[in-house]
Amino acid sequence: MADTTGRIPLWLIGTVTGILVIGLIGFFFYGSYSGLGSSL
């Protein structure tokens, strides 16, 4: 598990990416719920 990118740990990249993906999905669900994403 020592094979990292050198500067940023791989688990940190995975965690941040997961949070961004979940936030983006939640944002799209919120937009479609409030009617802002109904035109997409």
From Swiss-Prot:
Its main location: plastid. The chain crosses the membrane at residues 8-28. The keyword DNA-binding does not apply. GO terms for biological process: photosynthesis. It is a single-pass membrane protein. InterPro entries: PSII_PsbJ (IPR002682), PSII_PsbJ_sf (IPR037267). Gene3D superfamilies: 6.10.250.2070. SUPFAM superfamilies: Photosystem II reaction center protein J, PsbJ. Pfam families: PsbJ. Keywords: Chloroplast, Membrane, Photosynthesis, Photosystem II, Plastid, Reaction center, Thylakoid, Transmembrane, Transmembrane helix. It comes from the Eukaryota. GO terms for cellular component: chloroplast thylakoid membrane; photosystem II; photosystem II reaction center. It is found in: Plastid, Chloroplast thylakoid membrane. PSII is composed of 1 copy each of membrane proteins PsbA, PsbB, PsbC, PsbD, PsbE, PsbF, PsbH, PsbI, PsbJ, PsbK, PsbL, PsbM, PsbT, PsbX, PsbY, PsbZ, Psb30/Ycf12, at least 3 peripheral proteins of the oxygen-evolving complex and a large number of cofactors. It forms dimeric complexes. Belongs to the PsbJ family. One of the components of the core complex of photosystem II (PSII). PSII is a light-driven water:plastoquinone oxidoreductase that uses light energy to abstract electrons from H(2)O, generating O(2) and a proton gradient subsequently used for ATP formation. It consists of a core antenna complex that captures photons, and an electron transfer chain that converts photonic excitation into a charge separation. This is Photosystem II reaction center protein J. The gene is psbJ.
